[in-house]
From Swiss-Prot:
Keyword Transcription regulation assigned: no
Cell compartments where the protein resides: Secreted
Listed GO CC annotations: extracellular region
Name the record gives this protein: Megourin-3
Record note on modification: Contains four disulfide bonds.
InterPro entries: Megourin
Functional summary from the UniProt entry: Has antimicrobial activity against Gram-positive bacteria and fungi.
Keywords: Antibiotic, Antimicrobial, Disulfide bond, Fungicide, Immunity, Innate immunity, Secreted
Induction text: By bacterial infection.
Subunit text: Monomer.
Domain of life from the UniProt record: Eukaryota
GO biological process: defense response to bacterium; defense response to fungus; innate immune response; killing of cells of another organism
Species name: Megoura viciae (Vetch aphid)
Length: 63
């Protein structure tokens, strides 16, 4: 028997779409986040286009 939160965590990868400051921070945080159930592992960190802010969005394989 699974509760709603457990089911949601399997269907929805929480790491997908997470935003980090800086490429290195994203790579570390995203790799960890994409190890969660439903994520399928780390795919990439995508730079969010903005000249002043160095922000990166996390993508997991099955996100």
């Amino acid at each position: 028997y699974l509760d709603v939160n457990q089911i949601a965590s399997y269907l929805l990868c929480l790491g997908e779409g997470a935003v980090f400051n800086g490429r290195k921070t994203c790579q570390i945080g995203c790799r960890a986040a994409c190890q969660q159930p439903g994520c399928g592992g780390y795919k990439e960190c995508e730079q969010i286009p903005n000249i002043r802010l160095h922000k990166y969005r996390c993508h997991c394989i099955s996100g």
